[in-house]
């Protein structure tokens, strides 16, 4: 800070004079141009006094020192680009920062007094002087830059030329428009703050530190130019119009007065037009006033000063007309403007082409700049280059076929590509664009920083090897692109999440991590690669911890190792790197000075004690107890675990499937890991690495999404963990534990052979689709669900089918079903038949017993298939069914015991053998309405046997209308139990005393409809008998071959519909007899048909063969005879009476005769009456099964259909030279002469016989027959029927005949 520009009132001069910043207080303020000149004159008279009164003052009355430091170092909440930032103050209230994206302070040098403006240039204040340590040697990150020249301008603005391109930042490349008036500046650079647009600027510096707390100032004079102590704030610009910018450093509560040592640091404003931060100026001095107010003065950005220096060190090389530009002995030739004056200058190439080194070229502080989107080739045998570095601007590509000097580091910037094709034997520092490693061990070491650079492998062993493979990811990192090559690391030297390992090639890469001790990788992994960590044996303390992120569709594989995925403890600024030390003996330790860190901590000890947040002042980049953690997202295909441990820690979001064998999985692990060097892991000049891992307990929210397949393993899901098993869960000999506070949701089903212990929450649902409708999911537990805590919750809803017993001794909660569920929530991609079979029409089905006498259960729209004695404290049942049934291991009757039962609109279905039954026992309270009792009807009681079987008991005075009897359909009967209510001194009971049974008309009708499928198939074959060959009249050939295909659909009542496709081929021979032509032949057929109705569906495949004869009389009469056998393979699924799916075979015989006579009305028009009679045989079938324990059977015997048909066809022919087409139409009446077969149904109530019925229908058809030449005929006919119980809706018949 300029020491001579503070103002004090002088009794001698009667006005303000300039004195040192370190002098006493100011009593007035200066105005007027003459007064400024007078001040400057007095400045150089040496009116200086020494004091700390106006050193840096961070106001920590309600803010922490760390807040100001985080601010300047882009740490904590102050990340570059962040918005809506709120600082939590010591009193718990918040301060919201101005409404603007937070600036990136990376252009600010480590010591704060200089700012990079891109390339090899920086700005500062002139009064700092060239020889000042913070100007002569400037540092960003782990790199040191030497000033080689500078240019200055009035009043105090300086721009420096450095010896290297700065790789750590792109720099603050633009300045504010200083020609604007204050009002114009407000419009362009103003931001909203506390509801008002204000001209606010942001700053960072590391001047002499003091803190102000409740008006008291505590100095730390020894602290200045320390990179760790870089601090900042935002200020209000009070004056823009003069040659200085004046800022009010105390206009708001978050105030931090610029100090000695801040001189030259930049003032940033937000350009609302360009949507970026620009530099308004550099610190010149401070005005301090008697009233305690403070203004900082900034020299305005001077573009001309910058451009003059850049022009001095730039040399443009236009290669558009040159074949080769040659550099030899420091001289550039071949470009049309040969020169020797290029030393220390940036050679700025345009036009593309070749650059040839004919000797080694040391360009001092000058670099090579490639300025357009062209390709350049730099060649030169074994000659070397040395200079400021390589800048590939504007997407240019440079093929680098020379070597860089091995005693220097190559600096690479620019968004283009540097394609390195020779081993360099030196180090690379890159911060922008792409570097391609095209040679073995291309560089000794690579330092990548700023987050804008990529290094891509393009050769085997392109990295140098060693512990870190010679690549070091410094602040904000960059990308290593494996480019299809495999790469292994012992450790990846990465300091933050800016480090990225990826593979952009379509060829998969394998990234192997082989750490031999605990190690944290702070970066990210993504792209087309697999991640492997395989060890021969399992050892402790070599855990791999990922706290950055993973994003790949490929797999991760672990063997004999430990892996943790967790979030990252947010990094914060520290006062000092390391502890205070003094090597002097005790009597002389005062010479080492005080421990300023302890002093700073002491100033905030009271706030830390009150708020319990020691992490605010503990001088550590992070702490396990801090509340702010960054969430890491880890997305992969499948994680394969073999004898390994995998944990998901706090603030991790893991997305992927897991396959585990002999492994341990922990989701929500309370053990967390931090690195006390995070953000500062890269050491020295950028080619060293350190870590200090601290392990301890720290809890935060954990997310897991995916599926798990595990064998001989353990799974533990802990407090604050949320697991969404969106894919299937398969647990073989694997115990799963859900601890208190864990929340687990499964969607795609689960199978487990071991107990699942639940202290937290387990929700089982169906699988949702994009419309939030659900496919049913099955949850099968061969062991039990153990509810081990009072807070345990077991939930099933949204089309979940759950199997497994439930056990608990705790006051746990069981919640099955969903209030709003109905079949409309079923996903459109789900078979309704499947859903009905799994869920029984309910939202949830549960099969198992519940032994939880202290637990409470709620069942809404739930089908509980109770398979064993069960006990609950309370049960609330709504729109549900409790269905007592047996299991493979328990055939006994069961008792459900409940202390309190509230039941409404529910059913209780029980079994009985007419002497014993299932029971419902309510101990303390029973309430509800509209509930029904159903009792299985397994056998019919004899008239002399009087039933009196207790089904339900409840405390006396219970309303006897809670339950009522209801009929149920079992088999083919409607069965209504007779329920009698009795009340005694201590209880009320509902008992079974008899049954009423009647035939269920719908069930019998459904059975008859199913068995009628064979008749309809017979009828379709009948309709095919006489449609074989087309029109046989006037055929000249002696023999023929033919083929036909017929496809049709039909329908009947009860929702019946069928469709069929019939294919038939045949051959025949013509016999010319006296007065007639006789055709005899052989045919084979194949038919695919399917049929469905409201309660069944299925398909039939049929094959058949037959013989036929057709006589065509010269008089116009004809007779057609056919005999045929057909075999049918059937598969039908029925949903009535529990029939299920049946596979069975049947067969049928056909004998048909048709006669007709064709009368010619004219030579080419005719009318043809017809009559047909078909007699056949259809084989019978029989099914036997159980429905709800009742034995059922249904059968039909062989029967013989007899079907007649009469009708008339009319037609007209059209002919040409060698063709003839006949159009025809027909109308007929088809009728059954004999009823089709009888169906016999039997259940526990007796036998029911369903007589076959006759049917008839009207047939209608239109068609065309065509003759081409004498031997080719084909036809097409359309047909349908009406007025029948069964009708052909549409049928099309196509035939083709070839005669020879």
Swiss-Prot record:
Enzyme superclass (EC): hydrolase
Ways its activity is controlled: Inhibition of cytotoxic activity by phenylmethylsulfonyl fluoride.
Free-text description of this protein's post-translational modifications in UniProt: Cleaved to release the mature protein from the outer membrane.
Induction: Expression is optimal at 37 degrees Celsius, and inhibited at 20 degrees Celsius. It is dependent on both temperature and pH.
SMART domains per the UniProt record, alphabetical: Autotransporter
InterPro entries: Autotransporte_beta, Autotransporte_beta_dom_sf, Autotransporter_pectin_lyase_C, OM_autotransptr_brl_dom, Pectin_lyase_fold/virulence, Peptidase_S6, Peptidase_S6_dom
Keyword match Secreted: yes
EC identifiers of the protein: 3.4.21.-
Autotransporter domain mapped to chain residues: 1034-1300
UniProt GO BP: proteolysis
Residues covered by the Peptidase S6 domain: 57-311
Keywords linked to the UniProt accession: Cell outer membrane, Hydrolase, Membrane, Periplasm, Plasmid, Protease, Secreted, Serine protease, Signal, Transmembrane, Transmembrane beta strand, Virulence, Zymogen
Entry-linked CDD domains: PL1_Passenger_AT
Active site location: 127, 156, 263
Signal peptide residues on this chain, from the entry's feature table: 1-55
A GO cellular component annotation in the UniProt record: cell surface
Listed SUPFAM superfamilies: Autotransporter (SSF103515), Pectin lyase-like (SSF51126)
Site (Cleavage): 1023-1024
GO molecular function terms noted in the UniProt entry: serine-type endopeptidase activity
Functional description taken from the UniProt entry: Serine protease capable of cleaving pepsin A and human coagulation factor V, which may contribute to the mucosal hemorrhage observed in hemorrhagic colitis.
UniProt domain comment: The signal peptide, cleaved at the inner membrane, guides the autotransporter protein to the periplasmic space. Then, insertion of the C-terminal translocator domain in the outer membrane forms a hydrophilic pore for the translocation of the passenger domain to the bacterial cell surface, with subsequent cleavage.
Misc. comment: Mutagenesis experiments show the presence of a linker region, which is required for the translocation of the protease domain across the outer membrane. This linker region is located immediately upstream of the C-terminal helper domain.
NCBIfam families registered for this protein in UniProt: autotrans_barl
Protein name, per record: Serine protease EspP
């Amino acid at each position: 800070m300029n020491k001579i520009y503070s103002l004090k009132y002088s009794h001698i001069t009667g006005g303000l004079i300039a004195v040192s910043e370190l002098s006493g207080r100011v009593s007035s303020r200066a105005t007027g141009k003459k007064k400024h000149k007078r001040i400057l004159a007095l400045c150089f008279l040496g009116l200086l006094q020494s004091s700390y009164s106006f050193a840096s003052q961070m106001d920590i009355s309600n803010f922490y020192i760390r807040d100001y430091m985080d601010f300047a170092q882009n740490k904590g909440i102050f990340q570059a680009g962040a918005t809506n930032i709120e600082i939590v103050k010591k009193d718990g209230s918040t301060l919201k920062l101005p409404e603007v994206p937070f600036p990136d302070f990376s252009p600010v040098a480590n010591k704060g007094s200089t700012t990079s403006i891109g390339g090899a240039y920086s700005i500062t204040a002139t009064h700092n002087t060239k020889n000042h340590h913070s100007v002569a040697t400037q540092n960003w990150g782990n790199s040191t830059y030497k000033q080689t020249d500078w240019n200055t301008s009035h009043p105090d603005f300086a721009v420096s030329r450095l010896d290297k391109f700065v790789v750590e930042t792109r720099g603050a490349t633009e300045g504010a428009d200083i020609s604007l008036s204050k009002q114009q500046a407000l419009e362009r650079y103003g931001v909203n703050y506390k509801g008002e647009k204000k001209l606010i600027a942001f700053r960072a510096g590391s001047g002499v530190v003091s803190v102000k707390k409740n008006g008291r100032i505590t100095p730390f004079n020894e602290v200045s130019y320390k990179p760790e102590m870089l601090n900042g704030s935002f200020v209000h610009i009070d004056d823009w119009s003069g040659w200085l910018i004046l800022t009010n450093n105390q206009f708001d509560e978050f105030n931090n007065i610029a100090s000695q040592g801040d001189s030259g640091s930049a003032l940033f404003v937000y350009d609302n037009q360009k949507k970026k931060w620009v530099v308004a100026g550099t610190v010149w001095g401070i005005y301090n006033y008697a009233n305690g107010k403070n203004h900082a003065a900034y020299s305005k950005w001077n573009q001309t000063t910058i451009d003059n220096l850049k022009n001095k060190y730039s040399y443009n090389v236009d290669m558009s007309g040159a074949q080769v530009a040659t550099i030899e002995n420091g001289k550039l030739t071949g470009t049309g403007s040969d020169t020797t004056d290029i030393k220390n200058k940036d050679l700025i190439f345009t036009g593309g082409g070749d650059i040839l080194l004919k000797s080694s070229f040391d360009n001092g502080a000058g670099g090579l700049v490639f300025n357009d989107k062209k390709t350049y080739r730099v060649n030169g045998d074994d000659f070397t280059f040395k200079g400021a570095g390589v800048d590939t601007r504007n997407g240019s590509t440079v093929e680098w076929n020379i070597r860089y000097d091995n005693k220097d580091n190559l600096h690479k910037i620019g968004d283009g590509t540097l394609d390195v094709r020779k081993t360099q034997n030196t180090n690379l520092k890159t911060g922008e664009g792409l570097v391609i490693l095209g040679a073995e061990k291309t560089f000794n070491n690579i330092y990548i920083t700023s987050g804008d650079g990529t290094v891509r492998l393009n050769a085997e062993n392109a990295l140098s090897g060693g512990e870190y493979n010679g690549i070091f990811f410094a602040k904000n990192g960059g990308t290593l692109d494996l480019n299809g090559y495999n790469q292994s690391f012992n450790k990846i030297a990465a300091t933050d999440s800016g480090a990225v390992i990826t593979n952009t090639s379509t060829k998969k890469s394998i990234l192997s991590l082989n750490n031999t001790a605990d190690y944290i990788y702070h970066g990210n992994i993504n792209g087309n690669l697999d991640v492997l960590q395989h060890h021969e044996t399992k050892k402790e303390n070599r855990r791999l911890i990922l706290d950055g992120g993973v994003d790949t569709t490929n797999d991760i594989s672990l063997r004999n190792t430990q892996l943790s995925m967790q979030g990252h403890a947010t990094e914060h600024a520290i006062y000092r790197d390391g502890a205070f030390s003094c090597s002097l003996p005790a009597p002389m330790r005062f010479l080492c000075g005080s421990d300023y860190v302890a002093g700073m901590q002491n100033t905030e000890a009271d706030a830390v004690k009150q708020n319990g947040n020691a992490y605010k002042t503990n001088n550590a980049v992070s702490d396990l107890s801090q509340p702010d953690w960054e969430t890491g997202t880890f997305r992969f295909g499948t994680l394969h675990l073999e004898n390994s441990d995998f944990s998901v820690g706090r603030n991790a979001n893991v997305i992927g499937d897991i396959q585990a064998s002999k492994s341990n999985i922990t989701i929500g692990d309370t053990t967390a890991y931090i690195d006390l060097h995070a953000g500062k892991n890269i050491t020295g000049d950028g080619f060293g690495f350190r870590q200090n891992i601290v392990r301890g307990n720290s809890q935060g929210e954990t997310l897991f999404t995916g599926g798990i397949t595990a064998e001989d393993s353990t799974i533990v899901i802990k407090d604050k963990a949320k697991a969404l098993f969106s894919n299937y869960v398969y647990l073989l000999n694997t115990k799963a534990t859900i601890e208190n506070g864990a929340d687990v949701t499964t969607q795609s089903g689960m199978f487990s052979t071991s107990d699942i212990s639940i202290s937290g929450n387990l929700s089982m649902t169906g699988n949702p689709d994009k419309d939030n409708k659900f496919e049913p999911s099955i949850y099968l537990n061969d062991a039990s669900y153990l509810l081990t805590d009072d807070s345990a919750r077991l939930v099933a809803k949204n089309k979940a089918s759950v199997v497994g017993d439930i056990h608990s001794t705790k006051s746990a909660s069981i919640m099955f079903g969903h209030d709003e569920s109905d079949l409309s929530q079923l996903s459109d991609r789900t078979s309704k038949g499947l859903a009905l079979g799994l869920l029984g029409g309910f939202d949830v089905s549960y099969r198992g017993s519940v032994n939880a006498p202290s637990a409470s259960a709620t069942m809404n729209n739930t089908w509980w298939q109770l398979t064993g004695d069960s006990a609950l404290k309370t049960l609330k049942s709504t729109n549900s069914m409790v269905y007592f049934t047996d299991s493979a291991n328990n055939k006994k009757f069961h008792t459900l015991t409940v202390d309190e039962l509230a039941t409404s609109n529910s059913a209780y279905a029980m079994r009985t053998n007419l002497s014993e039954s299932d029971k419902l026992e309510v101990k303390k309270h029973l309430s509800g309405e509209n509930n029904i009792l159903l009792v299985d009807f397994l056998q019919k009681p004899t008239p002399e046997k009087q039933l009196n079987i207790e089904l339900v008991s409840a405390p006396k005075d219970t309303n006897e209308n809670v339950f009522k009897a209801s009929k149920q359909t079992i088999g083919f009967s409607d069965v209504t139990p007779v329920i009698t209510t009795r009340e005694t001194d201590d209880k009320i009971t509902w008992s079974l005393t008899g049954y009423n049974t009647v035939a269920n008309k719908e069930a019998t009708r459904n059975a008859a409809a199913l068995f009628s499928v064979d008749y309809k198939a017979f009828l379709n074959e009948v309709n095919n008998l006489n449609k074989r060959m087309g029109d046989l009249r006037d055929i000249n050939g002696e023999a023929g071959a033919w083929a036909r295909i017929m496809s049709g659909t039909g329908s009947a009542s009860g929702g019946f519909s069928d469709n069929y496709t019939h294919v038939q081929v045949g051959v025949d021979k013509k016999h010319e007899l006296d007065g007639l032509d006789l055709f005899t032949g052989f045919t084979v057929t194949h038919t695919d048909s399917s049929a469905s109705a409201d309660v069944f569906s299925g398909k039939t495949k049929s094959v058949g063969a037959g013989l036929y004869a057709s006589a065509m009389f010269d008089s116009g009469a004809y007779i057609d005879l056919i005999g045929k056998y057909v075999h049918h393979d059937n598969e039908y699924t029925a949903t009535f009476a529990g029939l299920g799916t049946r596979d069975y075979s049947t067969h049928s015989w056909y004998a048909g005769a048709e006669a007709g006579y064709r009368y010619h009305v004219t030579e080419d028009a005719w009318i043809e009456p017809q009559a047909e009679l078909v007699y056949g045989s259809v084989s019978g079938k029989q099914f036997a099964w159980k429905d709800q324990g009742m034995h059922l059977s249904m059968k039909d015997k062989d029967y013989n259909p007899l079907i007649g048909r009469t009708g008339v066809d009319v037609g007209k022919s059209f002919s040409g030279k060698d063709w003839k087409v006949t159009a025809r139409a027909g109308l007929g009446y088809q009728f059954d002469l004999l009823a089709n077969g009888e169906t016999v149904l039997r259940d526990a109530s007796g036998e029911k016989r369903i007589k076959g019925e006759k049917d008839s229908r009207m047939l209608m058809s239109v068609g065309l027959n065509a003759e081409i030449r004498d031997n080719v005929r084909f036809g097409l006919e359309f047909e349908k029927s009406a007025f029948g119980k069964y009708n052909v809706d549409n049928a099309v018949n196509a035939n083709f005949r070839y005669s020879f």
